[in-house]
Amino acid sequence: MIDSHIHSYYSKHAIGTIEEIVVSAIEKNIKYLTITDHAPFLIDKNNRLQDYELKYYFEDINTVQSKYSKDITILKGLEVDFVPKYISYTENLISDMNLDFLIGSIHFIFFENERINIWDIHKIHDEKVVSKYFLYLKELILSGLFDSIGHPDAILRGGIDEKIYYEKFFPLIKLMKLKNTSYELNTSGLRKSTYDINTNSENNGIWNYPCKSLLSTLNNNNIS
């Protein structure tokens, strides 16, 4: 079993040290584990690594890689926020990092006078937000910086039709093949609420992501 998206207490919204996470993964018979805490960024600084913590973060990963090498393969990674206008910041941040795996995720969508967060589920069904989200996805892939797209279908929490998501994402598959970018199968959507456009309410217990209808298409196109 493989887990390529995991956060420790370094991400501030998660709990557990890196070693505690590794021990738990071994108990669950996970054989490959990629530590991918949230990288430093220009905004939302309270939910991620701080610049000064990177040294300790990488040291902790090096320690568990050595200590548990007989039990599990541990990879060194980060989850990086992708915003086109801040791409130079991202390039500079990762330029001298010797990472095994890099996730690019879209958490923020910018307009002239507004920032929409991907967790603002009552806003992300808006047509202009959806269009810009897919523009960001395209630019993320074309940047060639990332091994995987983090939770690409998280926008389904906003209540948009899965068919719309499928139709908008399908043209990006050829770009993913060109750039050798993976599609993350993120199951956190199974425990998160979904916005109901008709009732203007959040509902639990409804499958929102991953996008079921897209999975077979990705598999048929050899997208991992």
Residue ranges of model-derived segments:
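Domain-core and long-helix interface of multi-subunit machines
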Residues: K12, D96-M97, G104-N221
